């Protein structure tokens, strides 16, 4: 999995490419934890995320809980396959997801 980050003031935008599974979720958790101090607005761009496993869902929930205490988190550009997983597991009700009818604006080009 590839992770790209952009910090603008108290806003952190993170784009993920590849698979967020049991192995890469550990890497992602460690990577993002180092960057959350002072962040009030976290944007996760999932346009290039092909797959998410339960370990990845756990990280998203953990991030949402953390950001609820220090600001907000929004997930955007969710692929159809990832959205299906979020819907089937009920996570789409727990996470702030930008709706698919919003125009896609890619954060990074991988």
What residues fall within each predicted segment?
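STAS-like cytosolic regulatory interaction modules
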Residues: 1-52, 62-110
